[in-house]
Amino acid sequence: GFIRIENATVQIANRIFETRLYNYFLTLPEVQNGEMYKLALRGRNQFIREGKLDMRLLLEKFTVHFDDIYGDRDEKFVEEDGRRYFMLYLKPIINGTGNYYVEARTRNQERTDLIIDYLGTQYIVEMKVWHGKAYNERGEEQLKDYLEYYHLKEGYMLSFNFNKKKEIGVKEIKIGDKTLIEAVV
């Protein structure tokens, strides 16, 4: 079947169905007529440099556009909402050339939030709703572990922070031999 009941909630039963549903919902006219999608579509060529996805620039632009459009929101926001906004922005940029995997499972049964595959290069993105510095540091450590698992040197973290005095932007963090590019919106 398409769905299963787990812990009293309905879940998509299969990763293929889940990806197809994400793709379907991201292609609906009302979604593609939204401001985030249009901004990404207009500027999509700037994110490809020498056949590679410029993830740092993508996060920088996403941060600016998200803050301009949704920055005043303080309503209930969950990690899944952030993933949808980011995927909506990402879709026209990688469309036809790249792909993404949502909550890809590692052999030790951990789940990465998003893996982008663009022309054979993988980019791991961890997304979090801000719940304080300690929680954020655990997310950074989790991303470092994913990078270790996938034998990558650089990973990306996107934090959705709804504090009034947050510092919006993109910064680089070194953890051992890994580089984390972290965006805060």
Q: What is each model feature region?
A:
Residues 1-95, 113, 119:
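C-terminal leucine-rich, beta-strand-based interaction scaffolds used for sensing/assembly
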Residues 129-135, 156, 182:
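Conserved RecA-like P-loop NTPase helicase motor core
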Residues 136-140, 147-176:
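Nucleic-acid nuclease catalytic cores
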Residues 97-103:
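Conserved RecA-like helicase motor-core motifs
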Residues 104-109:
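A short beta-turn/loop motif at secondary-structure boundaries
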Residues 86, 114-116, 120-131, 146:
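Conserved catalytic cores of phosphodiester-cleaving nucleases, focusing on short active-site segments
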Residues 173-185:
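Intrinsically disordered, low-complexity terminal regions enriched in charged/polar residues
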